[in-house]
Amino acid sequence: LAEPYSHGLSSLANEDCFREEVMRMSDKIKQMFGKAPKVFRNSSLIYSDEIGAQVAAMGFKGMLTEGAKYILGWKSPHYVYHCNQAPSLKLLLRDYKLSDDIGLRFSNSEWSEYPLFADKYINWIDALPQEEQVINIFMELSALGMVQPLSSNILEFLKALPYCAKEKG
């Protein structure tokens, strides 16, 4: 998963600078892991069709972006969409509610769903319409240890998710 090297806003200001930042990060990932990233995530999940076209021109196959209700309206974030200006670029939309339930609300004892356990979370996903099979959960790394203190058992929750998903089928 590539992103601008500085995690800045170059995608909004300067196309050349944006390309340089993305290529710098992509090169670093390839150097460290031996594989070039194929999916892109812009700083703060910023997206426009113009940015999508630039990302596709850099060779990326997909892009992770925000699936906010005010943007989607009646549409669901649980499908793969495509960039209007570069139809080969697949758009993976973050499910903001499911993501924020972990990233922001997990340890909030005043939250109506507190405490949140992995089996309960997987049941929420399982209750989604059967045709909605693409669920993108994404949060900032700061959610682990900063927003959600390690004492909240956030790591144990995350470790239990794959097991609970497998048990659910």
Per-segment meaning from a language model:
Residues 89-108, 136-145:
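Active-site clefts of carbohydrate-active enzymes
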Residues 39-42, 137-139:
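Extended hydrophobic secondary-structure segments that form protein cores and membrane-embedded regions
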Residues 1-38, 45-100, 115-132, 149-168:
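Catalytic alpha-helical scaffold of carbohydrate-active enzymes acting on polysaccharides/glycoconjugates
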